[in-house]
Amino acid sequence: MNKKNFMLGLGAFCMGGLFMGCQNEENDPTFSNHNNFKGNYVIPVTAGGTSYLLTAESLDEGKISVIENGKEFQDQISYWIFYDQNYFFGIKYNDGSQGTGGCYYLDANNVPQKKYSYTFNRFTTYGTWGDNVITVSTGDTKQTDSKGNAAQGFLFNYLNAKNGTTSTNQQDILAENFLGNGEKVTMAGFVEANGKLYTSIIPMGMSHYGVNTWPDKVLSQDYVATGTGGSGSGKYTAGQIPSTQYPDNAYIAIYSGSNFDEEPVIATTDKIGFACGRMRSQYYQTIWSDDDGNLYVFSGGYGRTATQPAADANLKAKVQGTLPSGVVRIPAGSTAFDEYYCNLETMSGASGHPLFRCWHFWAISARS
């Protein structure tokens, strides 16, 4: 895949264990005999449950077809991750089960070939950091409170893109009280820029462990469930706060090292709500950097969906957000938000609907 040099732009639409296995496939890549890639665009698509990888010389005109321009994949792919000039990864989200996927390269005939197959712990978001493709979810740790409730922690998976090895964090990294407000959190998306890693931190309410350990962080007993309710990833039981008490704040964790063991710097703003898209337990990335290293943080204002419970529910009240979809910025070289703000629902040409997901679009220019 002899190309790159990204020209970046932003586009928005409304809307701990080791890896279980890693298998080295035959036909390892020999990058010295790769042809120049035909076309400046690589386009993953899914139709009817089948995944394809297409190539195109232009997105401005003409048509594109899987015939002579595409490769059908036997494996179902939920997300594609492009890593430098040599590899691209396809990973499959399997609801609450383990994730699966593969590492691919283009052979001398520009046909995708699989280098590695892998199975790994369930994930809720993903990205790249250094030599690794990373995924993360949250789950129970070995740490418990006086009542035996397990503390929630981050479960990181690292797939090394250079040699195919896999690993995970070897010590518990708590997701409890991560922001100092008693709530458990998760992460949504990863951005490498300015020699640092940025990730959006999503507050998720207080677990049983959190309520018992930091009772002073409970803003109102009305927010604590008195029985079972909700469904799926939103299911809760008595004694926990099932949704955040801080829906109108966004948080970005900034890491300067090479792993998540370090203490990050937390940038906070009250101009927008927490920054992510969400579908069930998947948290979609809504933070992106531009060519100059400025980080743009998008929020759909999801806190507004925390509607008040019915009168007979096992939960008396929730904190409902008020902020609309918006975008703010952390300038390159800074660890704090600046004054930039844009209301995405009232800007010129806006539909008035909230943002669901956003993507970072780029064009690719071939090397000379």
What function would you assign to each model-found segment?
Residues 29-63:
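An edge-strand/N-cap motif at the start of beta-rich repeat modules
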Residues 36-47, 84-94, 130-147, 195-204, ...:
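Short beta-strand elements that form the blades of beta-propeller/WD-repeat-like
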Residues 294-298, 305-368:
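Long, well-ordered mid-to-C-terminal structural blocks that present hydrophobic/aromatic surfaces
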Residues 103-105, 151-163, 213-260, 312-334:
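Beta-propeller blade signature
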Residues 73-84, 117-132, 178-190, 274-287, ...:
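Repeated scaffold domains used in trafficking and secretory/extracellular systems
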Residues 52-173:
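Post-signal peptide N-terminal segment of secreted/secretory-pathway proteins
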Residues 63-75, 112-121, 163-180, 227-230, ...:
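Beta-propeller fold detector
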Residues 1-41:
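Bacterial Sec-dependent N-terminal signal peptides
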